[in-house]
Amino acid sequence: MTREERMVRDELSALARDDRGRHLLQLSLRGIQESGRGLTYGCWIKPDGGVAGCLFQHAYWQGVAEGVFKPAEHPKGEIKDYIGEEDFAIVMGAIRAFDVLGRRRFTHWRLGPYGLPQRSLDAERWHETVERILIDALAGSRPEGAAQPAPIPTPVP
């Protein structure tokens, strides 16, 4: 795991410790697995069409589909109201961490029209990596106050 991936995982793990934060990440996971929309980094939604979005945009779209969120022009307010001010700061930290990861590890420069450089996201690898980090963060974190697993009894000799 790279340093950038660790930063993203740490932010998501912090969010997953709260029930609503965990639910938001579960919405994100279902959204990126089921929606058929593209997955971006660093922004809520692509400015050129709105058919792709960041992890939390996917959570919003999935939440609207499941009746968790009301349709709104900007999902930021709905998500902030849902998870609260403190956890929303973690969401913003995660978006920044995703931006760093996406730009450093999954973006390649190529020559575009007229020989001008153009950024290109390796979308398939990006999607696979984000999904893996998200699953790892959910699996490795329990909400605060969740019951500890029962200890395994030691056999008596």
Which role fits each region the language model picked out?
Residues M1-P157:
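Short, glycine-biased loop/turn motifs at secondary-structure junctions and
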